[in-house]
Every structure is written in structure tokens, then in C-alpha cells.
């Protein structure tokens, strides 16, 4: 447990927008991104290749593609601004790149929420990468 706490504290200082992404997932999908989506299917987690395995994995595929289209900042590191208005997440700020990252994260969180019924932990958690070989373009 202590190791997990230390890792979480280290991540807070290192991965700005990834922590925000976790927060958005918690707010919108009511699940922990770290414990639910960090090693799921072919695309949820670090990297990604192959065919998305279900609608949840496709959320991660689309999120990866969205990050790939962002230019001018680092989607995983740079902090963005957002607010909540009438239960909706509203991305803000003057930096178009950071706003785009926020929109990517918001869309993924909504996708996770809308596809909770496809989430199959037993089948796709720590899915073997050998089953993720076919390349799929964004």
C-alpha cells in the first residue's frame, strides 16, 4: 500500500494533465481511470496498437488519436483549465492546444461513461499485447 501511495504522489508532480484526465474520468464516468483503464484492451494505458477489443477500448483508441492531432503542447504533461457548468465539463483557457487536450480528455471520459456496459475486466484487463498486432489508422 505504501508503494502505491508513493507512486501516486510521484505522478502528481510528473504528469500534469494525466492527473486531470483521472479527475475527469472520476467526475464523469464515476470510475478510477488508473484502476479501470490503465491496462485494458489494446489501447487503454501506455501506447497502443492493434484492433480495439470493445467499445471501452475504442474510447482509448479515439483518445490516443485525439492526442496525436494536438500540436503545440504536450498532452500528457501540460495542465489545462476547465470548469463545471450545470453538470457539464467546459474546457477553457486561452491556449488552444491545452484546450484541445481538455476536449480529448472530456470526450474520453464521456465515452467511458456511455460504454460502461461493455467494460469486461475479466476478459480485457492486462490483455496480452500479442493479441494487439493489426494496425488500425486513426
Curated annotation (Swiss-Prot):
Reaction catalyzed: a 1,2-diacyl-sn-glycero-3-phosphocholine + H2O = a 1-acyl-sn-glycero-3-phosphocholine + a fatty acid + H(+)
Principal place of residence: secreted
E.C. number(s) listed in UniProt: 3.1.1.4
Protein's UniProt keywords contain Secreted: yes
Gene3D superfamilies linked to this entry: Phospholipase A2 domain
Compartment(s) of residence: Secreted
GO molecular function, one term: phospholipid binding
Cystine pairs: 42-132, 44-60, 59-111, 65-138, 66-104, 73-97, 91-102
Cofactor note: Binds 1 Ca(2+) ion.
Active-site residues, record numbering mapped to chain: 63, 105
Binding site for Ca(2+): 43, 45, 47, 64
Protein's job: Snake venom phospholipase A2 (PLA2) that shows a moderate inhibition of ADP-induced human platelet aggregation when tested on platelet rich plasma. Exhibits high hydrolytic activities and prefers the anionic micelles (dPPC with deoxycholate) to the zwitterionic micelles (dPPC with Triton X-100). PLA2 catalyzes the calcium-dependent hydrolysis of the 2-acyl groups in 3-sn-phosphoglycerides.
PANTHER family, alphabetized: PHOSPHOLIPASE A2 FAMILY MEMBER (PTHR11716), PHOSPHOLIPASE A2, MEMBRANE ASSOCIATED (PTHR11716:SF9)
The protein, known as: Acidic phospholipase A2 Ts-A3
Organism: Trimeresurus stejnegeri
Amino acid at each position: 500500500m505504501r508503494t502505491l501511495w508513493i507512486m501516486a504522489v510521484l505522478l502528481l508532480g510528473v504528469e500534469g494533465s494525466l492527473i486531470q484526465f483521472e479527475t475527469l474520468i472520476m467526475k464523469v464516468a464515476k470510475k478510477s481511470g488508473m484502476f479501470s483503464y490503465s491496462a485494458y484492451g489494446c489501447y487503454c494505458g501506455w501506447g497502443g496498437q492493434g484492433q480495439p477489443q470493445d467499445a471501452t477500448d475504442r474510447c482509448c483508441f479515439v483518445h490516443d488519436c485525439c492526442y496525436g492531432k494536438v500540436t503545440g503542447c504536450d498532452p500528457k504533461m501540460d495542465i489545462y483549465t476547465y470548469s463545471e457548468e450545470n453538470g457539464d465539463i467546459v474546457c477553457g483557457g486561452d491556449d488552444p492546444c491545452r484546450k484541445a487536450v481538455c476536449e480529448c480528455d472530456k470526450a474520453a471520459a464521456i465515452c467511458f461513461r456511455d460504454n460502461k456496459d461493455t467494460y469486461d475486466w475479466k476478459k480485457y484487463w492486462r490483455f496480452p499485447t500479442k493479441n494487439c498486432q493489426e494496425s488500425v489508422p486513426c
